[in-house]
Design a protein with these regions (language model features):
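A short beta-loop-alpha structural element at the N-terminal edge
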Residues: 3-17, 21
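Conserved GNAT-fold acetyl-CoA-binding loop/helix
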Residues: 24-45
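A short helix-loop-beta-strand connector motif used in the catalytic cores of GNAT acetyltransferases and
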Residues: 42-59, 114-117
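Glycine-rich acetyl-CoA-binding "A-motif" of GNAT/NAT acetyltransferases
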Residues: 65-68, 157
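Conserved acyl-donor/pantetheine-binding loop and adjacent beta-alpha core of acyl/acetyltransferases
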Residues: 69-129, 176-180
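Conserved GNAT acetyl-CoA-binding A-motif
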Residues: 115-122, 144-155
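Conserved acetyl-CoA-binding loop-helix of GNAT-fold acetyltransferases
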Residues: 126, 130-144, 164
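C-terminal "cap" of GNAT-fold acetyltransferases
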Residues: 151-159, 175-191
């Protein structure tokens, strides 16, 4: 097993590039924007809108190379309208005519998110698949966040990984227009 180093990060460009590469084959990303060259720009827009700004952003390194990232939002976090407005041009650039699909996703999942305060794992992705990067990022995050946690798995193959960290599937949601399925998952507070 490779020993990875986890570092906190404020480098939105680096994190966006990692996530853009990590999600190149993601079913939801493909539905949202088939042009994989725009993925890093889309994650940059999401980070500009505020994801991770008050929570934690971890980068997983193998030697000196960044190979994964996780973005957590703290309980009660809602991006400010100013940050969201600042991100609109980035969203439009990344999504083009598919901007409405991004809004649909946000609107759909608002109803599945837990009402009680919780940590939200907005994104976790690895450029090295199947090598323990995701597990390392999840372990670090789960050791650091206190209280319940929530995520939306866009890939059914990742559900067993999240289940190993105590998450359970709470619903199965199919996106419109012949879209893929997404699985909201929740983990109660330890104890």
């Amino acid at each position: 097993v490779t020993a990875y180093a986890i570092e906190g990060s404020t480098d939105n460009k680096l994190v966006s590039e990692i996530l853009g590469e990590a999600f190149a084959d993601d079913p939801v990303m493909r539905w949202l924007q088939p042009d994989t060259t725009r993925y890093a720009a889309l994650y940059r827009a999401l980070l500009t809108a505020g994801h991770g700004s008050r929570g934690r952003i971890d980068v997983c390194c193998d030697g000196g190379r960044a190979v994964g990232a996780a973005v957590w939002d703290p309980p009660g976090f809602h991006p400010s309208s100013g940050r969201q407005l600042l991100a609109v041009p980035r969203f439009l650039s990344a999504l083009g005519g598919r901007y409405r699909r991004g809004q649909q996703i946000e609107e759909m999942f608002a109803g599945y998110r837990p009402r009680e305060p919780h940590w939200y794992l907005a994104f976790v992705g690895a450029t090295l698949q199947g090598r323990g990067v995701g597990s390392t990022l999840l372990r670090t995050g789960m050791e650091s966040v206190d209280g319940p946690a929530y995520l939306e798995s866009s890939n059914e193959a990742n559900i067993p990984l999240y289940e190993r960290f105590g998450f359970t599937v709470t619903a199965e949601v199919t996106l419109p227009e012949n879209g893929p399925t997404v699985w909201p998952m929740y983990r109660s507070a330890p104890g």
